[in-house]
């Protein structure tokens, strides 16, 4: 089909391919000559028909590629992190929905919540911890509704969620401390109650939600973590994180980590050929980040999906990071054209 398709745009090629597939699968009533004429192919209908229906023709190739993409795996995990609710990108739920039919698990690698209300960063107006809790609960309910095939949702601890522990530890009323849960994400597993203006509001725990109150977890042979370190050298964190866990004596093949709001990945051949993924973030940029410090670099946005079978080492070829465009570009606000 090469000669008579030469010069066609991608859109034109996709249209022809769709019509030919529909013809073979009986999904349209078009004759082969109709497809030839409508797309100005300048060939006899039998040339197109034979090219598409031949044992190694277009339809066979289409089926091969389709079935290859649909290879079955025991585990298909979507890894997201640094969502920083309520400052998440507007498309986070849509991204989860996009993969909801294929994934078996959703893993949140730290900083689901921002906990801005108990932050040490200066702010003229804060939204309040109660509002953050309710917002996050509603978000997780929506995720649970999207993942309606009983997919497990796993969360680990991030540095922002650790702010709750610091806040409680600084409280002067020691008698009140035992009544407060320093693990704020655990409240979405167990449920929680808010008392306001003499009224009681109860929020039930989210089904199929697991929280690991630690900065890393070993899921099969994948380490998921949220370290506190940064590095200005691209890819350096891949080595730093891998080296740390090898020194801890853990058995693993792959690492996925958040926190940096940057992205890099690769085989760490210096450390037993482990594969490490510095997973991008899914939050909007914060004002306090780009504030004049010259070491600042823009965030990278995205998420990662890993596919593997039980009792098998993760194959790096089945690891894919999806990169996203910047959702909010404030640079345009700082441009002035002089008359």
Residue ranges and their predicted role:
Residues 68-78, 216-223, 271-274:
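Beta-strand-turn-beta hairpins that frame and shape the catalytic cleft
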Residues 80, 85-191:
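Core catalytic region of metal-dependent phosphoesterases/phosphodiesterases
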Residues 18, 38, 44, 172-271:
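Charged, low-complexity C-terminal accessory regions
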Residues 33-53:
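Short, basic interhelical loop/turn and adjoining N-cap
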């Amino acid at each position: 089909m090469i000669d008579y398709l030469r010069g066609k745009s991608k859109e034109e090629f996709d249209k022809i391919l769709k019509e030919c597939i529909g013809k073979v699968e009986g999904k349209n009533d078009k004759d082969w000559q109709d497809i030839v004429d409508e797309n100005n192919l300048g060939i006899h209908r039998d040339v197109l028909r034979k090219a598409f229906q031949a044992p190694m023709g277009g339809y066979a190739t289409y089926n091969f590629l389709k079935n290859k993409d649909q290879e079955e795996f025991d585990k298909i995990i979507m890894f997201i992190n640094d969502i920083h609710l309520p400052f998440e990108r507007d498309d986070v739920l849509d991204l989860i929905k996009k993969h909801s039919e294929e994934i078996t698990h959703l893993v949140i690698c730290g900083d689901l919540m921002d906990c801005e209300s108990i932050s040490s960063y200066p702010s003229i107006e804060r939204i309040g911890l109660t509002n953050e809790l309710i917002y996050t609960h509603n978000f997780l309910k929506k995720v649970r509704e999207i993942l309606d095939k009983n997919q497990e949702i796993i969360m680990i601890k991030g540095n922002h969620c650790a702010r709750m522990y610091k806040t409680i530890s600084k409280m002067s009323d020691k008698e009140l401390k035992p009544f407060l849960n320093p693990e704020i994400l655990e409240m979405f597993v167990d449920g929680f109650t808010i008392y306001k203006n003499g009224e009681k509001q109860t929020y039930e725990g989210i089904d199929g939600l697991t929280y690991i109150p630690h900065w890393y977890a070993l899921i099969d042979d994948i380490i998921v973590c949220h370290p506190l370190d940064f590095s200005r050298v691209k890819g350096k964190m891949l080595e730093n994180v891998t080296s740390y866990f090898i020194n801890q004596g853990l058995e693993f093949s792959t690492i996925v980590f958040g926190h940096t709001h940057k992205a890099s990945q690769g085989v760490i051949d210096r450390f037993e050929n482990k594969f490490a993924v510095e997973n991008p973030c899914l939050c909007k940029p914060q004002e306090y980040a780009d504030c004049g410090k010259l070491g600042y670099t823009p965030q990278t946005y995205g998420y990662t999906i890993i596919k593997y079978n039980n009792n098998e080492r993760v194959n790096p070829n089945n690891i894919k990071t999806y990169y996203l465009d910047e959702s909010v570009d404030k640079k345009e606000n700082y441009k002035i054209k002089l008359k």
